[in-house]
Swiss-Prot record:
Alphabetized NCBIfam families for the sequence: lysS_bact, PRK00484.1, PRK12445.1
Gene Ontology molecular functions: ATP binding; lysine-tRNA ligase activity; magnesium ion binding; tRNA binding
Predominant subcellular localization, coarse grouping: cytoplasm
Catalytic activity: tRNA(Lys) + L-lysine + ATP = L-lysyl-tRNA(Lys) + AMP + diphosphate
Species whose genome carries this gene: Salmonella typhimurium (strain LT2 / SGSC1412 / ATCC 700720)
Cofactor: Mg(2+)
InterPro entries in UniProt: Aa-tRNA-synt_II (IPR004364), aa-tRNA-synth_II (IPR006195), aa-tRNA-synth_II/BPL/LPL (IPR045864), Lys-tRNA-ligase_II (IPR002313), Lys-tRNA-ligase_II_bac/euk (IPR034762), Lys-tRNA-ligase_II_N (IPR044136), Lys-tRNA-synth_II_C (IPR018149), NA-bd_OB-fold (IPR012340)
Biological classification of the source: Bacteria, Pseudomonadati, Pseudomonadota, Gammaproteobacteria, Enterobacterales
Protein name: Lysine--tRNA ligase
Domain of life: Bacteria
Subunit architecture: Homodimer.
SUPFAM superfamilies hit by this protein: Class II aaRS and biotin synthetases, Nucleic acid-binding proteins
Gene name, Swiss-Prot/TrEMBL: lysS
Keywords, alphabetical: Aminoacyl-tRNA synthetase, ATP-binding, Cytoplasm, Ligase, Magnesium, Metal-binding, Nucleotide-binding, Protein biosynthesis
Gene3D superfamilies in alphabetical order: Bira Bifunctional Protein, Domain 2, Nucleic acid-binding proteins
């Protein structure tokens, strides 16, 4: 047996012994009828206590004679004979308990408290005071075991080191990792901030189907499921776009939805098959209006959630305070590949030659617009570090966007980039039903030619357009990627509570 295997075997034995001892303690508690009581009520959380009383002097606290009730998980314990110090962790953080034998009911300290384990959930009552080192603490007069933990916590000094274990056992990650807890608290604040921002601008939050007969609104490979009652194959949605625009046809002129999308594609540091998007649609607006709205949204969230418009990310600092850069797709190609002759991007053979020279395999089904987009992705995207809007996307890769009035080969569309990755996609919506029908047919032909991500023909949506869609602009923002930026997280799994994982065999 190797040294590593031997160590692993020893750890399993230690865990089994630890769990056996804890189960024996639980059995004893069951005999006493008190393993999982549900009659303890707290009146403060740790963060509330620190916010209210950290600034007070020891003498002032003593004079105030404040009694509080707290509850949480026992993370550390230092037993020093007749007295002990405990670190209690709750949703707000940590608070120290001072537990003295003579200040508790008879028998509680020796017969109960000293037999409890780290990870157990406790309820405590007592008076606030400050230790000689100035730490806010609770001098306990009542201490109760609320939940017996049968498994030990991760090592208190090293936490949960295995990255896979952090994702599979997120509950342990949240218990032992302050950074992880703060990431998901920030995510919650971002979502609340988005909703507040949107409602303040007259948008109505709605919900649209997660299972669809025809998946639409994006170019992606869908998940397929089966509806037994209808005996019908259905698709988990890849985007809510076509349903949201039906609502605009119906007269809801400003709508948004924050919900999950599903795309049956690869998993990477930037991609999870199940992810959260915010999509909005705004009647009597164009893509330029949404560029302004997007810039305002990100600037507002940075200031309100983080308290600054200077957001650190790795070695970079994103500046949301100054105006965001705006480039056309071709300008971006020229900027990051200066040797490009712009005229070559107007010619199929010349553009194909450029693409192949930088390692892009050009598929037979691609037209000029797709080739130029692939060149942009290859030479420019990774360099778009500071907040940047890219405009003038080819119509070929924008089947739902309105054609530009001056040049019908491009659309009134933008994508928003930060940190070298796309965060948002918006455009003036195509509201010409006949043009939309033809573009759907083009997508059907592309699918027949082997493009698995090409869109389906959605006849019902074309029918909706035939009733009249007002001039409208729409925007989609990837919430997970947004949270990555605001929390300095470098893999999407760090900002999704339960990311997709292969089952453990």
């Amino acid at each position: 047996m190797s040294e590593q295997n031997a160590q692993g075997a020893d750890e399993v034995v230690d865990l089994n012994n630890e769990m056996k001892a804890r189960r024996e303690k639980l059995a004893a508690l069951r005999e006493q009828g008190i393993p999982f009581p549900n009659d303890f009520r707290r009146d403060r959380t740790s963060d509330q206590l620190h916010a209210e009383f950290d600034a007070k002097e020891a003498e002032e606290l003593e004079a105030l004679n404040i009694e509080v009730s707290v509850a949480g998980r026992m993370m550390t314990r230092r037993i020093m004979g007749k007295a002990s110090f405990v670190t209690l962790q709750d949703v707000g953080g940590r608070i120290q308990l001072y537990v003295a034998r003579d200040d508790l009911p008879e028998g509680v300290y020796n017969e109960q408290f000293k037999k409890w384990d780290l990870g157990d959930i406790l309820g405590a009552k007592g008076k606030l005071f400050k230790t000689k080192t100035g730490e806010l603490s609770i001098h306990c007069t009542e201490l109760r075991l609320l939940t017996k933990a049968l498994r030990p916590l991760p090592d208190k000094f090293h936490g949960l080191q295995d990255q896979e274990a952090r994702y599979r056992q997120r509950y342990l990650d949240l218990i032992s990792n302050d950074e992880s807890r703060n990431t998901f608290k920030t995510r919650s604040k971002i979502l609340a901030g988005i909703r507040q921002f949107m409602v303040a601008r007259g948008f109505m939050e709605v919900e649209t189907p997660m299972m669809q007969v025809i998946p639409g609104g994006a170019s992606a490979r869908p998940f397929i499921t089966h509806h037994n009652a209808l005996d019908l194959d259905m698709y988990l949605r890849i985007a809510p776009e076509l349903y949201l625009k039906r609502l605009v046809v119906g007269g809801f002129e400003r709508v948004f939805e924050i919900n999950r999308n599903f795309r049956n594609e690869g998993i990477s540091v930037r991609h999870n098959p199940e992810f959260t998007m915010m999509e909005l649609y705004m009647a009597y607006a164009d893509y330029k209006d949404l560029i302004e709205l997007t810039e305002s949204l990100f600037r507002t969230l940075a200031q309100d959630v983080l308290g600054t418009t200077q957001v650190p990310y790795g070695d970079e600092v994103f500046d949301f305070g100054k105006p965001f850069e705006k480039l056309t797709m071709r300008e971006a190609i020229k900027k990051y590949r200066p040797e490009t002759d712009m005229a070559d991007l107007d010619n199929f053979d010349s553009a194909k030659a450029i693409a192949e020279s930088i390692g892009i395999h050009v598929e037979k089904s691609w037209g000029l617009g797709r080739i130029v987009t692939e060149i942009f992705d290859e030479v420019a995207e990774a360099h778009l570090i500071q907040p940047t809007f890219i405009t003038e996307y080819p119509a070929e890769v924008s089947p739902l966007a309105r054609r530009n009035d001056v040049n019908p080969e491009i659309t009134d569309r933008f994508e928003f980039f930060i940190g070298g990755r796309e965060i948002g996609n918006g455009f003036s919506e195509l509201n010409d039903a006949e043009d939309q029908a033809q573009r759907f047919l083009d997508q059907v032909n592309a699918k027949a030619a082997g493009d698995d991500e090409a869109m389906f023909y959605d006849e019902d949506y074309v029918t909706a357009l035939e009733h009249g869609l007002p001039p409208t602009a729409g925007l989609g923002i990837g919430i997970d990627r947004m949270v990555m930026l605001f929390t300095n997280s470098h893999t999407i799994r760090d900002v999704i509570l339960f990311p997709a994982m292969r089952p453990v065999k």
